[in-house]
């Protein structure tokens, strides 16, 4: 009897144990990441040929304590290596684990290699060659704390490499994980299977191999035991011949049929090629189709299983489309696949909730580093595909109410960009802004006390409801997460799309970018302030400090300003401001753009202006600014500098976003200035619920100064 170890992905150990026992293994014991078992040579070869779930089959050779690198060397050298493989064979060492003495796996592998080579040279005065690619013999060493285990890897390459998949689509499933997903899905051989997002076809091919009784190792061209001195070639030939006979018979006898589709034609061609190499092409029908065109291939029966590993998305921007996809997919399942089973494997349980289906079984497993879940559903017939109650119903009702009121108001105002929802309900802490035909949903970062998975689920519910209420295609919704920006983060790109959208605000045309930055280039809450500046600027010299994308300069220019001067520290935003000015025909030397630290520029200029707009940050500590700036602490210093530039009958519009800001009116008076708060006048209908989003003041020379 041989003592053997079969490794597998975490979470699949119980399934693997059952599989090995069905093959005839004895004394199976589960450990994390695998199963120890006993078996004769026939069982050993059968496990290699027939296990659909094992990653590797290892033959343990020695186990010993390791307190130093010398212990490791001597423990490996104690094995009679020339009795295991010939000196003319190549070998490789796979070493995993570290302890206090062996702190680097590469160093550990080097010591093992030296011990094996020295074992040969001492006994034979010859040495075998190390080969990194497809070695004849693969030695596996696992070090955990002070215990090392040395084993012969009988698999060679991982057993998930069946030999049929040369090319793959993006993010493939390993074949042994795919086999586990199928076994857990409840699918029965003899019944049909559909994978509507099949990629390179792994799930369908693995199921077809099961249905046709085809051994998963039948197509492998390289093994880790053929150069082993104890290799029983006759027994191996007998077992593979038997497997070939079973595969031919199974292909003829199976009644299972398989159907796969994917939007990517290139990947579908790969899937077809993979199925041909696996010997099951005649059982599988592949089509290049968008999932929205999915139909039941067997509407008259029999019923079967829909199984898939749908996309889950790694970037925030992809989530609206994925939420819409899962929502649509859930409706399609109820409409066209009543009576079937559905099984989905995903790294995002939140996306699976968008199906609006109730799972009857759930499993957990790892897909590489990802924690994944598999959910099984029994689909009931529902020709209309009607779902249950709309998710986030309170939010949906509030959004619907706001839209009815604000869409009409915005049309009357002549604006295309406005806020539809602003954390109106505490459970749904998002802002929803309309920009022409597009909508931006910004999630305010939840407190650290909120469970991240619950917060993500609630966000997905919001997106689902937003798409439904606004009847919006998913590619028209942009998702962002708003957090406090520090230092240069406010200027850094979130994406690299470079997609600009031209929108209308009263008589101005303004460019916005909804994807590349945290902000879009247009502060919606300052809309009325910009309109006021336009009316104030006719025939005047206008200065815009901390100008951002220069939208206030555009309104001043369109209002008939004699000149506009736009100052900001960011080259990116100044180029954007120039683009905005140009879109409104505001070109020429009278429209200046200056890249500078606004505070330094203010201290060093003696120019005079009639209208000054300043909207400074609440706090800034940019490296390009020599000192920090706090709007509450420093607003008098700012006003003192602005007074120098303000003509006698001029006006400063001063705005900021600091909640609870207190204007030092006594200090203002001491400077010879007067300040009047106009916050209420600058707040529009779409920000009626958020009276503290900004505060705004008009500052002029006092009567005595004039």
From Swiss-Prot:
Its EC number is 2.1.1.173, 2.1.1.264. One of its GO terms (molecular function) is RNA binding. It comes from the Bacteria. It is found in: Cytoplasm. Gene3D superfamilies: 3.30.2130.30, RNA methyltransferase domain (HRMD) like, Vaccinia Virus protein VP39. Keywords: Cytoplasm, Methyltransferase, RNA-binding, rRNA processing, S-adenosyl-L-methionine, Transferase. Disulfide bonds: none annotated. Residues 43-154 form the THUMP domain. It catalyses: guanosine(2445) in 23S rRNA + S-adenosyl-L-methionine = N(2)-methylguanosine(2445) in 23S rRNA + S-adenosyl-L-homocysteine + H(+); guanosine(2069) in 23S rRNA + S-adenosyl-L-methionine = N(2)-methylguanosine(2069) in 23S rRNA + S-adenosyl-L-homocysteine + H(+). One of its GO terms (cellular component) is cytoplasm. The keyword tRNA-binding does not apply. Its main location: cytoplasm. Specifically methylates the guanine in position 2445 (m2G2445) and the guanine in position 2069 (m7G2069) of 23S rRNA. Belongs to the methyltransferase superfamily. RlmKL family. HAMAP family: 23SrRNA_methyltr_KL (MF_01858). This is Ribosomal RNA large subunit methyltransferase K/L. The lineage of its organism: Bacteria, Pseudomonadati, Pseudomonadota, Gammaproteobacteria, Enterobacterales.
């Amino acid at each position: 009897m041989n003592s053997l170890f079969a490794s597998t992905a975490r979470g699949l150990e119980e399934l693997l144990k059952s599989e090995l026992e069905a093959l005839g293994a004895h004394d199976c014991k589960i450990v994390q990441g695998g199963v120890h078992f006993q078996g004769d040579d026939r069982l050993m070869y059968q496990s290699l040929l027939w296990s659909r779930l094992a990653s590797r089959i290892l033959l343990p050779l020695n186990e010993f304590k390791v307190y130093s690198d010398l212990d490791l060397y001597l423990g490996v050298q104690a094995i009679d290596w020339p009795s295991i493989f010939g000196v003319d064979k190549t070998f490789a060492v796979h070493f995993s684990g570290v302890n206090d003495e062996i702190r680097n796996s590469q160093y550990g592998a080097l010591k093992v290699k030296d011990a094996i080579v020295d074992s040969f040279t001492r006994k034979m005065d010859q040495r075998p060659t190390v080969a990194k690619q497809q070695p004849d013999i693969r030695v596996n060493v696992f070090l955990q704390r002070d215990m090392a285990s040395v084993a012969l890897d009988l698999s060679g390459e991982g057993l998930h490499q069946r030999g049929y998949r040369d090319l793959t689509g993006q993010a493939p499933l390993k074949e042994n994980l795919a086999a586990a997903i199928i076994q857990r899905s409840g699918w029965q051989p003899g019944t049909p299977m559909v994978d509507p997002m099949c990629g390179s076809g792994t799930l369908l091919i693995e199921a077809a191999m099961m249905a046709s009784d085809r051994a998963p190792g039948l197509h492998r061209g390289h093994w880790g035991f053929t150069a082993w001195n104890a290799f029983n070639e006759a027994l191996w030939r007998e077992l593979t011949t038997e497997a070939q006979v079973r595969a031919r018979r199974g292909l003829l006898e199976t009644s299972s049929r398989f159907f796969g589709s994917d939007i990517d034609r290139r990947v579908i061609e790969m899937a077809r090629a993979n199925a041909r190499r696996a010997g099951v092409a005649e059982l599988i029908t592949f089509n290049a189709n968008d999932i929205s065109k999915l139909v039941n291939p067997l509407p008259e029966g029999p019923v079967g299983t829909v199984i898939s590993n749908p996309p889950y998305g790694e970037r925030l921007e992809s989530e609206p489309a994925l939420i819409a996809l899962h929502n649509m997919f859930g409706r399609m399942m109820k409409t066209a696949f009543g009576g079937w089973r559905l099984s989905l494997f995903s790294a995002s349980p939140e996306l699976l909730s968008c199906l609006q289906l109730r799972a009857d079984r759930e499993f957990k497993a790892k897909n590489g580093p990802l924690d994944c879940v598999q959910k099984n559903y029994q689909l009931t017939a529902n020709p209309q595909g009607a779902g249950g109650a709309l998710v986030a119903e309170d939010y949906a009702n509030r959004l619907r109410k706001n839209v009815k009121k604000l869409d009409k108001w915005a049309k009357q105002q002549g604006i295309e960009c406005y806020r539809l929802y602003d954390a109106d309900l505490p459970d749904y802490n998002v802002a929803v802004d309309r920009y022409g035909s597009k909508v931006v949903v910004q999630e305010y970062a939840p407190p650290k006390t909120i469970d991240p998975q619950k917060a993500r689920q609630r966000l997905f519910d919001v997106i689902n409801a937003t798409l439904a209420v606004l009847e919006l295609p998913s590619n028209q919704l942009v998702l962002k997460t708003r957090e406090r920006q520090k230092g240069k983060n406010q200027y850094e790109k979130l994406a690299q799309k470079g997609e600009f959208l031209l929108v209308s605000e009263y008589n101005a045309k303004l460019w916005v970018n909804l994807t590349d930055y945290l902000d879009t280039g247009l502060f919606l809450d300052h809309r009325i302030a910009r309109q006021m500046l336009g009316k104030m600027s006719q025939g005047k010299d206008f200065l815009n400090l901390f100008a951002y994308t220069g939208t206030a300069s555009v309104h001043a220019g369109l209002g008939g300003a004699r000149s506009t001067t736009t100052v900001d520290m960011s080259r990116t935003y100044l180029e954007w401001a120039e683009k905005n000015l140009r879109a409104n025909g505001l070109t020429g030397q009278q429209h200046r753009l200056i890249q500078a630290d606004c505070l330094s520029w203010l201290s060093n200029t003696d120019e005079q202006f009639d209208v000054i707009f300043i909207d400074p940050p609440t706090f800034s500590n940019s490296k390009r600014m020599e000192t920090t700036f706090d709007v509450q602490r420093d607003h008098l210093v700012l006003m003192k500098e602005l007074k120098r530039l303000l003509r006698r009958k001029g006006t400063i519009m001063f705005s900021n976003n600091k909640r609870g800001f207190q204007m030092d009116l006594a200090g203002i008076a001491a400077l010879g200035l007067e300040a009047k708060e106009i916050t209420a006048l600058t707040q529009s209908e779409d920000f009626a619920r958020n009276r503290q989003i900004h505060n705004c003041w008009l500052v002029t020379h006092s009567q005595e100064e004039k």
